[in-house]
């Protein structure tokens, strides 16, 4: 290993100066990296036995679960690991919003947004691969949303499908991209890490103080390893042994039948908030735009660069707005799993409007509090 590369690795993982007062919320990024590595490894093992053929895909999944030694554990680890990955990713994003990392490190925030989008795309592609009833119809419904694009919509849908319906060509494309995208995510994660360590990590005070810092190793490496051990215990003992497929939709275990449409089509739980927003808008193109903005709005947070950073812990209004926003996320997730009927339809629209309004109010409130403090200090 070249000396320069060795120095970069040691600086990034061992000798990095880290604030002494960071809490467990700052460990989530490292846990996400470990989970990403685990997902890549389990995915490679699954790909050794998976058959991307419409006539035998579902049978190959049954073969993995029944005949391959430890195959059931590998598949359960991969499926439940994806759920845990998104749990931690949402917590990681929430920590960044709460402590306003988008102001302190805007470039790192934007690259992290790319990681989030690529992770969502990878998870959606993987959801289709078992070729169950919900997988097939989920792919049909979600990809058909591209038809809302003016002029190019129908051509885009045909291009994604590879034909005039979801078929063998679609499965081949989804399998190829699901295998490749995690490595693209890995590249963006490394860029995210380099940008983060370029300026140093923030702290619960909401600043970039360089006064009190310690070496990342051994003070924080052991802490991360202990949390990762607890995470593995939760994943394998509770999710893989006790509740093997509790987070999966039951219709996923029924082989795909293009002639029978499920009464209720829904994605995985970590996409339900966006799915509820999609269904809340009566217009198809309006729903697609709202669906896209429910994720892309994260890129607007660095627009608050005109203000200084201040932790939400010192902003009571910001705390109310932040936890209100978290409540909206959970409510929309619940509504996304509910059938399309009253009163769920009437509840979804106002919650969707609030979902887009509250983040803007949060950023405005933070800027207002900061300017108020600056004004009071100027009076002294």
Curated annotation (Swiss-Prot):
CDD domains per the UniProt record, alphabetical: Cytochrome_b_N (cd00284)
Residues that span the membrane, as ranges: 28-48, 72-93, 109-129, 174-194, 222-243, 285-305, 317-337, 344-364
InterPro entries the record matches: Cyt_b/b6_C (IPR005798), Cyt_b/b6_C_sf (IPR036150), Cyt_b/b6_N (IPR005797), Cytb/b6-like_sf (IPR027387), Cytochrome_b_N_euk/bac (IPR048259), Di-haem_cyt_TM (IPR016174)
Principal localisation: mitochondrion
Pfam families: Cytochrom_B_C (PF00032), Cytochrome_B (PF00033)
GO BP, one annotated term: mitochondrial electron transport, ubiquinol to cytochrome c
Protein name: Cytochrome b
Organism field: Cepaea nemoralis (Banded wood snail)
Taxonomic lineage: Eukaryota, Metazoa, Spiralia, Lophotrochozoa, Mollusca
């Amino acid at each position: 290993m070249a000396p320069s590369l060795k120095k970069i690795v040691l600086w990034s993982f061992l000798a990095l100066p880290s604030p002494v007062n960071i809490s467990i919320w700052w460990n989530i990024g490292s846990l996400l990296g470990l989970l990403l590595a685990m997902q890549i490894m389990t995915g490679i093992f699954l790909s050794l036995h998976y058959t991307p053929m419409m006539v035998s895909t579902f049978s190959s999944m049954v073969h993995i679960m029944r005949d391959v030694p430890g195959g059931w554990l590998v598949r359960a680890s991969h499926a439940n690991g994806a759920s845990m990955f998104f749990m931690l990713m949402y917590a990681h994003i929430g920590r960044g919003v709460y402590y306003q990392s988008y102001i302190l490190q805007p470039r790192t925030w934007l690259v992290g947004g790319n990681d989030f989008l690529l992770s969502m795309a990878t998870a959606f592609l993987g959801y289709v691969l078992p070729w169950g009833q919900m997988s097939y119809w989920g792919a049909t419904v979600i990809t058909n949303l591209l038809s809302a694009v003016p002029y190019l919509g129908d051509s885009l849908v045909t291009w994604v499908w590879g034909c005039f319906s979801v078929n063998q060509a679609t499965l081949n494309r989804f399998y190829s991209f699901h295998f490749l995208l995690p490595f693209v995510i890995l590249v963006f994660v490394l860029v995210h890490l380099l940008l983060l360590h370029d300026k140093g990590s923030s702290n619960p005070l909401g600043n970039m103080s360089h006064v009190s810092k310690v070496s990342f190793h051994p003070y924080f490496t052991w802490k991360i390893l202990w949390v990762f051990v607890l995470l593995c215990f939760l994943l394998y003992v509770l999710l893989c042994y006790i509740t093997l497929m509790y987070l999966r939709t039951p219709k996923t275990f029924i082989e795909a039948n293009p002639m029978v449409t499920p009464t209720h089509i829904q994605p995985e739980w970590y996409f339900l908030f966006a799915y509820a927003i999609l269904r809340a808008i009566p217009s198809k193109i309006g729903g697609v735009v709202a669906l896209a903005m429910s994720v892309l709005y994260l890129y607007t947070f660095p627009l608050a660069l005109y203000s200084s950073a201040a932790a939400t812990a010192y902003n009571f209004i910001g705390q109310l707005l932040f936890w209100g926003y978290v409540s909206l996320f959970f409510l929309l997730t619940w509504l996304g799993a509910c059938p399309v009927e009253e009163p769920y339809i009437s509840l979804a629209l106002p919650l969707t409007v609030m979902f887009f309004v509250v983040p803007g109010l949060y950023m405005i409130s933070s800027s207002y509090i900061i300017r108020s403090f600056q004004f009071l200090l100027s009076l002294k």
